Amino acid sequence: MPKTSKEMVAEADATVPRVSGTEAKAMLGKPGVVFVDLREPAEIAASGKVPGALAIPRGLLEFRADREAATPDPTLTGAKTVVLYCASGGRAALAGKTLQELGYGDVKNLARFQDWVEAGGEAEKT
């Protein structure tokens, strides 16, 4: 039986650990930790992003995260811990499950960029 998108997000949420904005702030700048903003460029331009985060729209993630793809991102493929976020958490959950399937061992879901901001995190303007 086909799954709904809501079911897919719930399944991904169950496998990708969540981190709070406060926990994410403590991770920023640590060796091997990479933040990935999965929002579209216009969304990032409107609100900024976590300082130093890679901006990889959800639709391009597999091609940038796959070490054997034509266009892997060396910053992402070399990460020990990947912290994902988007606007509402759904894209981050699905992306986290995808990264796990690609062999990434330590993937975290910050969920919403707003969680970062509400925890006092700075927004880097692009």
Regions picked out by a protein language model, each given a short descriptive name:
Residues 1-33, 41-83, 88-126:
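Rhodanese-like catalytic fold shared by cysteine-dependent sulfurtransferases
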Residues 36:
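Active-site flanking residues adjacent to catalytic metal/cofactor-binding acidic residues
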